[in-house]
């Protein structure tokens, strides 16, 4: 029996052994309307990601996680942090290509927003042999990625939405008046670039897509991965608070927190998050919840040891191990990576530091690099006391849900 036939039969048997996706999962009701900040009890440790917003129900199976809890997390993250992602089904995206420039137009509700993107293709990329792509904002080490056979597409995020309270740019041309953060607006820009690549750039494989940015743009890249299931790999670099920095743990001594972030750049997120200022321990989620909402798709977290402001240590010893508990339980632990380096904030070396993992995900190129190492730090296990209470799951069945959900999720466009 050939290996391909063997894998086909094995996959079929695994799927037959599990409940059909067509069998509707009965989900606990999400409170409606969503509770206000004062309604939540303070919690010093990370919230249990397996517990629903009602505070009583708990996930028991992987099927339930994907069909019930993960969608609830996406809703509550929009309610309490990002603002509600626009209905993409009401948008019409068109694009024209002139050499290596994409001109993108998005129409919705009788309004139009426009911006552009730049295409950088590796040698040998063609319609017959399309390359994977990383879509980046704010700069990236193009040459390292191009040499590795990965296309790099960039766009000016300020043409989508400014980094200010101003309401200019393509996104606000369509959605002015909505309580939506700039991180979500920039994420929307990533997604519309991907639409344009699908339409006009056959040299790029639009099913193998990474998204990246650093600092506030790393927060935006995280939002891009969160809100579009076509994203294969999310690459938030030094993302800090409202990214993968934990709200409840500031371990650097001078770090970004909810208070100084909302004071300095309140437009990054919606107004509701501001109601948790000085009471972040009431938030019904933390950074690990955001990461878990992206599973089973891949994430690599870049952190510099000499980058205290974005709480690199907190991301490494609190967020990463807590999120990995969920990924491991889902049978996709290898999809979550941590890349600690010696440098500072947004060093270009960060992009080469994560490149072996990028190639493993986007090109199936094996790497010997250990992307689970927390060195020079160690996990703060007291931050997630629920770690010993993961829902039961037969180890032999762990990999099957990943196979079933990968196809369903990566073929689905933004919410």
Model features per residue range: what roles?
Residues 133-136, 151-156, 210-212, 232-237, ...:
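Structural recognition of the beta-strand scaffold that forms the well-ordered cores
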Residues 143, 160-162, 218-220, 241-246, ...:
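Flexible loop/turn segments at secondary-structure boundaries
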């Amino acid at each position: 029996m050939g290996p391909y036939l063997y894998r086909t039969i094995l996959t079929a048997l695994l799927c037959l052994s599990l409940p059909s996706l067509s069998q509707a999962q009965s989900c606990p009701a999400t409170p409606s309307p969503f509770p206000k900040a004062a309604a939540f009890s303070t919690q010093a440790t990370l919230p249990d990601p397996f517990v629903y917003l009602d505070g009583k129900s708990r996930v028991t199976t992987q099927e339930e996680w994907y069909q019930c809890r993960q969608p609830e997390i996406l809703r509550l993250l929009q309610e309490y942090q990002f603002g509600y992602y626009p209905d993409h089904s009401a948008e019409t995206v068109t694009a024209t290509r002139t050499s290596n420039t994409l001109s993108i137009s998005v129409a919705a509700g009788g309004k139009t927003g426009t911006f552009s993107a730049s295409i950088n293709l590796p040698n040998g990329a063609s319609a017959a042999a399309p390359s994977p792509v990383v879509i980046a904002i704010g700069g990236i080490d193009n040459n390292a990625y191009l040499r590795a056979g990965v296309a790099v597409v960039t766009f000016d995020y300020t043409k989508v939405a400014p980094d200010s309270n101003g309401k200019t740019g393509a996104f606000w041309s369509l959605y002015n008046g909505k309580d939506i953060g700039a991180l979500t607006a920039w994420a929307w820009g990533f997604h519309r670039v991907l639409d344009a690549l699908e339409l006009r750039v056959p040299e790029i494989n639009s099913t193998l897509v990474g998204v990246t940015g650093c600092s506030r743009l790393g927060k935006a890249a995280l939002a891009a991965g969160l809100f579009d299931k076509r994203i294969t790999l999310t690459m938030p670099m030094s993302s800090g608070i409202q990214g993968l920095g934990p709200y409840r743990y500031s371990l650097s001594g001078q770090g970004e927190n909810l208070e100084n972030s909302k004071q300095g750049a309140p437009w990054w997120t919606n107004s509701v998050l501001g109601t948790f200022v000085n009471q972040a321990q009431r938030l019904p989620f933390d950074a690990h919840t955001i990461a878990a909402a992206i599973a089973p798709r891949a994430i690599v977290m870049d952190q510099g040891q000499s980058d205290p402001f974005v709480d690199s240590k907190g991301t490494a010893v609190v967020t990463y191990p807590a999120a990995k508990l969920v990924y491991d339980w889902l049978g996709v632990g290898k999809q979550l990576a941590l890349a600690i380096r010696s440098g500072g904030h947004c060093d270009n070396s960060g992009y080469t530091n994560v490149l072996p993992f990028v190639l493993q995900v986007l090109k199936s190129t094996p790497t010997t690099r250990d992307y689970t190492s927390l060195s020079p730090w160690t996990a703060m296990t007291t931050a997630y006391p629920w770690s010993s209470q993961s829902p039961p799951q037969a180890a032999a069945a762990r990999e099957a849900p990943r196979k079933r959900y990968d196809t369903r999720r990566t073929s689905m466009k933004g919410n």
